[in-house]
Regions:
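Bacterial N-terminal signal peptides that target proteins for export
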Residues: 1-9
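Bacterial N-terminal signal peptides
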Residues: 8-17
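N-terminal maturation segment of proteins
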Residues: 17-112
Length: 112
């Protein structure tokens, strides 16, 4: 009887810990997915030619700003999103999101 109770307790602890880990991983995935969505939206807004090439015509009436102020604004944008990305534990992301996060990180670092 004691062995059955101990086995049941261990099983419940395992299930609880697995659930907690999955919840943490899902939270990291949701956090990254929101960041990625915000990044893409801002990227299309600040690079209207790319938006048009990709079929998003909301910014067709604009051109990219290549002035010093525009370059500084894009640099600040890249730094902001890189810092937000660094705050996410990539090890907790799903495989697909982990790959996307690494691609995003490489792109942000390249643009700095």
């Amino acid at each position: 009887m004691l062995k059955k109770v101990a086995a049941l307790a261990l099983t419940l602890i395992f299930v609880l810990l697995t659930t907690m880990a999955n919840t943490t991983n899902q939270t990291a995935d949701r956090q990254f997915e929101k960041l990625a969505k915000d990044y893409i939206e801002k990227l299309l807004e600040t690079s209207p030619e790319w938006a048009t090439i990709l079929g998003d015509h909301r910014f067709d009436n604009r051109l990219s700003d290549y002035s010093l102020a525009g370059v500084q604004k894009r640099r600040a944008f890249n730094e902001e999103f890189l810092n937000k990305l660094k705050a996410i534990d990539l090890a907790r992301l799903s495989k697909a999101n982990n790959i996307d996060a690494r691609i995003m990180r490489d792109n942000l670092e390249y643009n700095l």
